[in-house]
């Protein structure tokens, strides 16, 4: 999916995050993959995860989130810095179980970039358990 480079990088990054959340909660793998650049990276503690392609991303998420996971919500998203082709977002993430009980609450830094004709998440660093 090729997108025009918009006037506001921050607005584009926030739109990526909205699409990512809806695709994740709907378990729509193709839509989710469209919100990520590959290879995609995630730093948790000192462990760097790398997904070279979309094929294993969603199954890996299910393993990370646990069997109790039912949905994710962004508690807050704040633009930290933006340039014409990169945006840093500070995100507070909540995960909920099927009874809508909070099962995870953590901060994450997302880096959304415009490359290969589209805005998508390239990297994130999370303080997840």
Where would I find each of the regions flagged by the language model?
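A short, structured loop/turn motif at beta-sheet edges
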Residues: 79-87, 113-118
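Short, low-complexity N-terminal intrinsically disordered segments enriched in polar/charged residues
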Residues: 1-38, 55
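Short, well-ordered beta-strand segments in beta-rich or mixed alpha/beta enzyme
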Residues: 20, 32, 42, 86-96
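Hydrophobic/aromatic beta-strand elements that line small-molecule binding cavities or substrate pockets
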Residues: 74-80, 92-95, 107-113
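A solvent-exposed, acidic/Ser-Thr-rich amphipathic alpha-helical stretch
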Residues: 29-81
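Short beta-strand edge/turn micro-motifs at domain boundaries
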Residues: 103-129
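Short beta-strand segments enriched in hydrophobic/aromatic residues
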Residues: 36-37, 93-95, 125-126
């Amino acid at each position: 999916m090729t997108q025009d480079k918009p006037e506001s990088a921050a607005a584009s990054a926030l739109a990526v995050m909205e699409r990512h959340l809806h695709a994740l909660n709907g378990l729509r793998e193709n839509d989710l993959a469209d919100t990520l650049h590959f290879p995609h990276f995630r730093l948790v503690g000192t462990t760097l995860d790398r997904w070279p392609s979309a094929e294993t991303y969603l199954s890996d998420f299910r393993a990370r989130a646990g069997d109790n996971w039912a949905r994710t919500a962004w508690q807050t998203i704040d633009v930290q810095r933006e340039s014409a082709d990169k945006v840093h977002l500070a995100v507070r993430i909540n995960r909920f179980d099927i009874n809508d009980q909070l099962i995870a609450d953590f901060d994450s830094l997302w880096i959304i970039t415009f490359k290969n004709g589209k805005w998508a998440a390239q990297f994130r660093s999370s303080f997840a358990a």
